Amino acid sequence: VKLKILTSVAALCALFLLSSCAPTVHLEPAANANDPLCAEVTVRLPDSIGDQDRVWTDAQATAAWGTPSSVLLTCGSEPPAPTTLQCVSLGGVDWIVDEEDTPNLRLTTYGREPAAQVYVDTTTLSADAVLESLAGAIQQLPKTGECTAPVTEDPDVVGDETGDTAP
């Protein structure tokens, strides 16, 4: 009996030590992170994207992958207004591509409410692969509009200047 108790205590201690070593990424929640639709998104997010495993975050309706994080997601943003930035459609979701901080991209859903934003370090993962991996979860957000003519065929998100803009 003592051996069973000691084994159980040792296993619990090992689990605690391993979980305390897991990184927690600090993120700020979006203004509408408490929207129940964001909960529908977060429970459907993948455990990994490419070779990047999901890591803990400390804010509602957020997610991160990789150590250090190469993909960050927040849900609950205000939907973006029409813009001249490139728009791509991947996995049934329209995205506005902000390349201002290349090689890091900010991708914002277009025509979904609430909106979600994804930040991708493209030196680690392809933005296209990230968006395809997230599409199933993001589709939980109701579609309220779409880009007028988004890039849909082989849309290499980075550096594709031929994409249409959001209306």
Give a label for each model feature:
Residues 84-167:
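Extracytosolic low-complexity repeat regions of secreted or lipid-anchored proteins
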